[in-house]
């Protein structure tokens, strides 16, 4: 899906789903330290369980806008704001794997905050009230 189609899809979703949104930003450490004691696998399993439970709950599914950012040597967008189902699909398509020796936590948090500010403006533009966003950092 190209950027234009993605925007149209989001506009359609905003028009059809009038639920107040809760923006949930998962900021995930994928530095080499996450190899210790299988930490990365536990994080991926936990995110998958969270996304599946969110997707299976009607109220949560309609309200949750989920974004996933990973950070190791660099910060990377894994899944832009969307449904739990979209985030799960993106997580399966681009699994978070431990890479690099550095942990650029600030870069990951800054990217997440920038994405959050943009998405908050998108919601305001369609008069959608949003709850206070969650920023969850796993390191």
Where on the chain are the PLM-derived regions?
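Short, mixed-charge, low-aromatic patches
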Residues: 1-9, 62-72, 107-111
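A short small-residue
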Residues: 25-31, 89-96
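DG-centered beta-turn motif at the end of beta-strands
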Residues: 26-31, 43, 68, 112, ...
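Acidic, polar low-complexity linker/tail segments
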Residues: 1-25, 30-41, 118-128
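Von Willebrand factor
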Residues: 17-81, 92-132
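Short, flexible, mixed-charge acidic loops at enzyme active sites
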Residues: 79-89
């Amino acid at each position: 899906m190209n950027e234009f189609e993605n925007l149209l899809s989001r506009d359609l979703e905003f028009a059809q789903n009038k639920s107040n949104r809760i923006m949930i930003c998962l900021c995930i450490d994928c530095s080499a330290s996450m190899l210790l004691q299988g930490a990365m696998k536990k994080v991926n399993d936990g995110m998958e369980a969270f996304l599946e439970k969110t997707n299976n709950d009607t109220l949560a599914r309609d309200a949750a806008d989920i974004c996933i950012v990973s950070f190791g040597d660099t910060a990377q967008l894994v899944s832009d704001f969307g449904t739990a189902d979209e985030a799960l699909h993106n997580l399966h398509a681009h699994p978070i794997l431990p890479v690099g020796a550095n942990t650029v936590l600030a870069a990951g948090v800054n990217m997440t905050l920038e994405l959050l500010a943009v998405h908050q403006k998108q919601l305001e533009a369609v008069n959608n009230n949003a709850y206070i966003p969650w920023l969850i950092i796993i390191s």
